[in-house]
Protein backbone atom coordinates (compact mmCIF):
# COMPACT_ATOMS: atom_id res chain seq x y z
CA UNK A 1 0.00 0.00 0.00
CA UNK A 2 1.07 3.51 -0.73
CA UNK A 3 1.55 6.05 2.01
CA UNK A 4 -0.83 8.95 2.68
CA UNK A 5 1.76 11.39 1.35
CA UNK A 6 2.11 9.50 -1.94
CA UNK A 7 -1.68 9.35 -2.41
CA UNK A 8 -1.93 13.11 -1.88
CA UNK A 9 0.85 13.70 -4.40
CA UNK A 10 -0.90 11.52 -6.98
CA UNK A 11 -4.19 13.40 -6.52
CA UNK A 12 -2.52 16.80 -6.68
CA UNK A 13 -2.92 18.88 -9.86
CA UNK A 14 0.60 20.26 -9.44
CA UNK A 15 3.10 18.33 -11.54
CA UNK A 16 6.26 17.23 -9.85
CA UNK A 17 9.53 18.83 -10.96
CA UNK A 18 11.40 16.48 -13.27
CA UNK A 19 14.85 16.72 -14.79
CA UNK A 20 15.11 17.95 -18.34
CA UNK A 21 15.75 15.03 -20.65
CA UNK A 22 16.95 17.22 -23.48
CA UNK A 23 18.84 20.48 -23.63
CA UNK A 24 16.42 22.73 -25.50
CA UNK A 25 19.08 25.37 -26.04
CA UNK A 26 20.75 23.10 -28.59
CA UNK A 27 17.57 22.85 -30.70
CA UNK A 28 17.96 26.16 -32.50
CA UNK A 29 15.56 26.67 -35.39
CA UNK A 30 17.02 28.97 -38.04
CA UNK A 31 14.16 30.66 -39.90
CA UNK A 32 15.68 34.01 -40.84
CA UNK A 33 18.11 32.76 -43.49
CA UNK A 34 17.45 29.74 -45.77
CA UNK A 35 21.17 29.24 -46.61
CA UNK A 36 22.22 28.97 -42.95
CA UNK A 37 19.20 26.74 -42.24
CA UNK A 38 20.20 24.36 -45.07
CA UNK A 39 23.80 24.08 -43.80
CA UNK A 40 23.00 23.94 -40.06
CA UNK A 41 24.17 20.89 -38.12
CA UNK A 42 21.83 20.25 -35.16
CA UNK A 43 24.39 18.04 -33.42
CA UNK A 44 26.74 21.04 -32.99
CA UNK A 45 26.43 24.12 -30.80
CA UNK A 46 25.81 27.62 -32.14
CA UNK A 47 29.50 28.56 -31.80
CA UNK A 48 30.62 25.38 -33.57
CA UNK A 49 28.13 25.83 -36.41
CA UNK A 50 29.16 29.44 -37.02
CA UNK A 51 32.84 28.50 -37.02
CA UNK A 52 32.20 25.63 -39.45
CA UNK A 53 30.35 27.97 -41.83
CA UNK A 54 33.13 30.58 -41.65
CA UNK A 55 31.08 33.05 -39.58
CA UNK A 56 31.42 34.66 -36.15
CA UNK A 57 28.82 34.26 -33.41
CA UNK A 58 29.96 37.54 -31.78
CA UNK A 59 31.42 40.61 -33.47
CA UNK A 60 33.40 41.69 -30.41
CA UNK A 61 36.34 39.90 -28.86
CA UNK A 62 35.56 36.85 -26.74
CA UNK A 63 35.81 37.37 -22.98
CA UNK A 64 36.51 33.70 -22.33
CA UNK A 65 34.93 30.30 -22.47
CA UNK A 66 36.23 29.51 -25.93
CA UNK A 67 36.48 25.91 -26.98
CA UNK A 68 40.11 24.90 -27.33
CA UNK A 69 41.11 23.00 -30.44
CA UNK A 70 42.63 19.63 -29.57
CA UNK A 71 45.27 18.60 -32.10
CA UNK A 72 45.78 14.98 -33.08
CA UNK A 73 49.19 13.30 -33.24
CA UNK A 74 49.04 13.42 -37.05
CA UNK A 75 48.51 17.20 -37.01
CA UNK A 76 51.34 17.71 -34.49
CA UNK A 77 53.74 15.62 -36.60
CA UNK A 78 52.73 17.47 -39.77
CA UNK A 79 53.46 20.81 -38.06
CA UNK A 80 56.87 19.61 -36.90
CA UNK A 81 57.75 18.37 -40.37
CA UNK A 82 56.60 21.67 -41.85
CA UNK A 83 58.68 23.75 -39.44
CA UNK A 84 61.70 21.49 -40.04
CA UNK A 85 61.37 21.89 -43.81
CA UNK A 86 61.39 25.71 -43.63
CA UNK A 87 64.52 27.29 -45.02
CA UNK A 88 66.36 29.56 -42.58
CA UNK A 89 68.27 32.70 -43.69
CA UNK A 90 71.52 31.10 -42.49
CA UNK A 91 70.92 28.16 -44.85
CA UNK A 92 70.52 30.50 -47.85
CA UNK A 93 73.86 32.19 -47.06
CA UNK A 94 75.68 28.86 -47.26
CA UNK A 95 74.29 27.58 -50.58
CA UNK A 96 74.63 28.52 -54.23
CA UNK A 97 72.01 26.06 -55.47
CA UNK A 98 68.85 27.91 -56.72
CA UNK A 99 66.76 24.80 -55.93
CA UNK A 100 67.54 25.26 -52.21
CA UNK A 101 66.56 28.95 -52.13
CA UNK A 102 62.80 29.73 -51.82
CA UNK A 103 61.12 31.32 -54.82
CA UNK A 104 60.94 35.11 -54.43
CA UNK A 105 64.23 35.28 -52.50
CA UNK A 106 67.81 35.56 -53.70
CA UNK A 107 71.38 35.28 -52.45
CA UNK A 108 73.81 38.11 -53.10
CA UNK A 109 77.46 37.13 -53.56
CA UNK A 110 79.83 40.04 -52.89
CA UNK A 111 83.47 40.64 -53.70
CA UNK A 112 85.62 40.13 -50.61
CA UNK A 113 87.76 43.19 -51.32
CA UNK A 114 85.31 45.77 -52.68
CA UNK A 115 82.11 44.36 -51.09
CA UNK A 116 80.33 44.88 -54.41
CA UNK A 117 77.65 42.48 -55.63
CA UNK A 118 79.22 40.29 -58.29
CA UNK A 119 76.51 37.65 -58.57
CA UNK A 120 72.82 37.22 -57.75
CA UNK A 121 71.33 33.73 -57.34
CA UNK A 122 67.53 33.73 -57.57
CA UNK A 123 65.65 30.95 -55.77
CA UNK A 124 63.52 28.45 -57.66
CA UNK A 125 62.25 26.31 -54.76
CA UNK A 126 58.44 26.25 -54.55
CA UNK A 127 57.06 27.05 -51.11
CA UNK A 128 53.47 26.18 -50.13
CA UNK A 129 51.46 29.09 -48.77
CA UNK A 130 50.43 28.94 -45.15
CA UNK A 131 46.75 28.09 -45.15
CA UNK A 132 46.45 28.62 -41.40
CA UNK A 133 47.02 32.37 -41.57
CA UNK A 134 43.32 32.94 -41.11
CA UNK A 135 40.86 30.73 -39.24
CA UNK A 136 37.89 32.01 -41.21
CA UNK A 137 37.92 30.90 -44.84
CA UNK A 138 35.77 32.29 -47.62
CA UNK A 139 33.75 29.11 -48.06
CA UNK A 140 31.01 28.45 -50.57
CA UNK A 141 28.45 29.21 -47.83
CA UNK A 142 29.83 32.73 -47.41
CA UNK A 143 29.69 33.28 -51.17
CA UNK A 144 26.05 32.16 -51.18
CA UNK A 145 25.30 34.50 -48.26
CA UNK A 146 26.95 37.44 -50.05
CA UNK A 147 24.90 36.76 -53.20
CA UNK A 148 21.72 36.38 -51.13
CA UNK A 149 22.37 39.66 -49.27
CA UNK A 150 23.11 41.53 -52.51
CA UNK A 151 19.96 40.18 -54.15
CA UNK A 152 17.64 40.93 -51.22
CA UNK A 153 19.09 44.37 -50.47
CA UNK A 154 17.71 45.61 -53.80
CA UNK A 155 14.15 44.52 -52.92
CA UNK A 156 12.06 47.23 -51.27
CA UNK A 157 9.46 45.68 -49.00
CA UNK A 158 6.27 47.65 -48.51
CA UNK A 159 4.99 47.71 -44.93
CA UNK A 160 1.50 46.28 -44.54
CA UNK A 161 -0.85 47.34 -41.76
CA UNK A 162 -2.24 44.77 -39.35
CA UNK A 163 -5.97 44.02 -38.99
CA UNK A 164 -6.09 45.90 -35.71
CA UNK A 165 -4.41 48.94 -37.26
CA UNK A 166 -6.86 48.86 -40.19
CA UNK A 167 -9.81 48.84 -37.78
CA UNK A 168 -8.31 51.76 -35.86
CA UNK A 169 -7.79 53.83 -39.03
CA UNK A 170 -11.30 52.98 -40.21
CA UNK A 171 -12.74 54.21 -36.88
CA UNK A 172 -10.81 57.49 -37.16
CA UNK A 173 -11.93 58.06 -40.75
CA UNK A 174 -15.58 57.23 -40.07
CA UNK A 175 -15.65 59.59 -37.09
CA UNK A 176 -13.64 62.57 -38.41
CA UNK A 177 -13.40 62.13 -42.19
CA UNK A 178 -10.42 64.11 -43.51
CA UNK A 179 -10.19 66.42 -40.50
CA UNK A 180 -6.77 65.38 -39.18
CA UNK A 181 -6.67 68.10 -36.51
CA UNK A 182 -9.74 66.59 -34.84
CA UNK A 183 -8.15 63.14 -35.12
CA UNK A 184 -5.08 64.48 -33.35
CA UNK A 185 -7.09 65.72 -30.36
CA UNK A 186 -9.26 62.60 -30.09
CA UNK A 187 -8.15 61.18 -26.73
CA UNK A 188 -10.12 57.95 -27.06
CA UNK A 189 -8.96 56.88 -30.52
CA UNK A 190 -5.58 58.64 -30.75
CA UNK A 191 -4.19 57.13 -27.56
CA UNK A 192 -0.59 57.26 -28.83
CA UNK A 193 -0.98 61.04 -29.48
CA UNK A 194 0.21 60.86 -33.07
CA UNK A 195 0.61 64.11 -34.96
CA UNK A 196 -1.74 65.32 -37.70
CA UNK A 197 0.95 64.71 -40.34
CA UNK A 198 1.50 61.12 -39.20
CA UNK A 199 -2.26 60.47 -39.16
CA UNK A 200 -2.61 61.99 -42.63
CA UNK A 201 0.11 59.69 -43.98
CA UNK A 202 -1.48 56.59 -42.44
CA UNK A 203 -5.03 57.45 -43.53
CA UNK A 204 -3.89 58.26 -47.09
CA UNK A 205 -2.15 54.90 -47.35
CA UNK A 206 -5.16 53.11 -45.84
CA UNK A 207 -7.53 54.80 -48.31
CA UNK A 208 -5.30 53.80 -51.22
CA UNK A 209 -5.27 50.13 -50.14
CA UNK A 210 -9.06 50.09 -49.66
CA UNK A 211 -9.76 52.09 -52.87
CA UNK A 212 -11.36 55.02 -51.01
CA UNK A 213 -11.21 58.43 -52.63
UniProtKB/Swiss-Prot annotation:
Annotated Basic residues bias: 1-23
Record's subcellular location: Nucleus, Nucleolus
Annotated S-S bridges: none
Coiled-coil ranges (or none): none
Main location as per UniProt: nucleus
GO biological process assignments: ribosomal large subunit biogenesis; rRNA processing
GO cellular component, one term: preribosome, large subunit precursor
Keyword Nucleus applies: yes
Keywords tagged on the record: Nucleus, Ribonucleoprotein, Ribosome biogenesis, rRNA processing
Chain residue ranges for the region called Disordered: 1-25
Tagged with keyword Nucleotide-binding: no
Pfam families to which the protein is assigned, alphabetical: Nop16 (PF09420)
PANTHER family per record: HSPC111 PROTEIN-RELATED (PTHR13243), NUCLEOLAR PROTEIN 16 (PTHR13243:SF1)
Role of this protein: Involved in the biogenesis of the 60S ribosomal subunit.
Protein family according to the UniProt entry: Belongs to the NOP16 family.
Subunit organization: Component of the pre-66S ribosomal particle.
UniProt-recorded name of the protein: Nucleolar protein 16
Organism the protein comes from: Scheffersomyces stipitis (strain ATCC 58785 / CBS 6054 / NBRC 10063 / NRRL Y-11545)
